[in-house]
Amino acid sequence: YRSLYGLQGIKTMLRGTLRNDGFCAAWDVLVQLGCTDDTYPMEGVESMTHRSFLNAFTGYHAARKLEEKISSQLGLAADGPELARLKWSGLFEDTPVGLNEGTPAQVLEHILNKKWKLEPNDKDMIIMWHRFRYAKDGRGNEIQATLVAKGDDSTRTAMAKTVGLPLGIAARLILEG
């Protein structure tokens, strides 16, 4: 970003991304539990529900609900944003997973795609705002840049245009020399 915004002389630069409240922390819960592991096939996937999938990572406890076990295991508030996001994603539902086999990561992806999938006429949008505050020659300065990208439909999405397409172009250029 330094050269892109003409900030080559800046000694220290920090970059961060803000997402919806609780999103990153909720994803971290899934990582800590082991739900994103793609190195081994799970057993019994064909009979799993969303809830039993998540329960597979918490250990058996006859008297405690899944939500309580996750809260206790990871030191989370029972009414915190992490569990609220997991609940919104449908992970505590007794809905059948709908796969015959898969790794934890594949099962999780399948569950989340049911909730996050765009319908044929849906469109996505990416809004980015960069603000750089820096000191140069003893004076405070600021540069701002924005990007708004709109998807055309559920296939030609803003995400595909801004992430997938540039990556595909780069790969093709590398392959073509």
Description of each model-found segment:
Residues Y1-G177:
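C-terminal catalytic/substrate-binding lobe primarily of soluble NAD(P)-dependent oxidoreductases
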